[in-house]
Amino acid sequence: MKDIPVKIQLDQVTFQLKEHHNFDWLLKLGTVFAVFDQQDSGNLSFGVEKNGHKKFIKYAGAQTLAYKGTMGDAIEKLKNSVSLYEELKHDSLIKLIEHFPVHTGYVLIFDWFDGECLHSHWSFPPPEKYKNPNSPFYKFKHLSVMERIQSLNSIFSFHTFVEKKNYVAIDFYDGSILYNFHTNETNICDIDLYSKKPYVNKMGRLWGSSRFMSPEEFELNAMIDARTNVFNMGAMAFALLGGGKDRSFTNWEASKELYEIAFRAVNDNRIKRYASVETFYKAWLNVANAKKI
């Protein structure tokens, strides 16, 4: 027999969980104005406002409908992510303010970034994501090529920094990206599974969206490294400037020179890719800065 979801109302928002949960701790932080309850990570996130200041709250400890794992694992992953947000602090990453345990769960509090998620599957599930003029992804794809390249530059700059810090990006996809259409700023909002190198694939199929994943992210005992992240960056370039998994030049909206850089990055043969995100980004910038966009 299927469990009947429990409806929860907090201030301006309503959502469902597998069972009742106490959110008194959250209400003390301010007025809840947004909820993000469709993630399969086990996390439940909120927008909270107090005295005109907005914060983004990420919480593990409640039985969300989409999560298939154990609550202990969700809490542990969220706790472990704290050091990532501290060590990888960057202008293009949401800013962690504080973190603490509550009841049987754990909370991370970030500064609120006023952006829209490029993979808002809860509001615009495909094909709406690609066709609805109100979809953040649709709006992003209708920005100028230059604006999209600047957004990609923020993403590549951050991952060059991640690489220098001896980390590897895991589970990076368009759902990790927030874009502010008023200021044209880009922020990364989810690095919870990024890991220190060396990192070996012990799962077979790693976490992530197949649209952005390299062959080695499906291969048991494969090394996940800088060349893997080069593939991820190239795949993101095709998602935001081209035809996504259709990596033909026909659907590419920027220059042939930039296309060739992105196409080399997503070579299935890892040896033929750029050796690092840094070398990929330098080649990309050399072309973009020469106005060969």
PLM features per residue range, with description:
Residues 103-117, 121, 125:
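Conserved short submotifs of the Hanks-type protein kinase catalytic core
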Residues 202-217:
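Conserved activation segment of eukaryotic-like protein kinases, specifically the C-terminal portion
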Residues 1-34:
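Juxta-kinase regulatory segment immediately upstream of eukaryotic protein kinase catalytic domains
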Residues 159, 163-180:
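Catalytic-loop of the protein kinase fold
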Residues 216-227:
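Conserved end of the kinase activation segment
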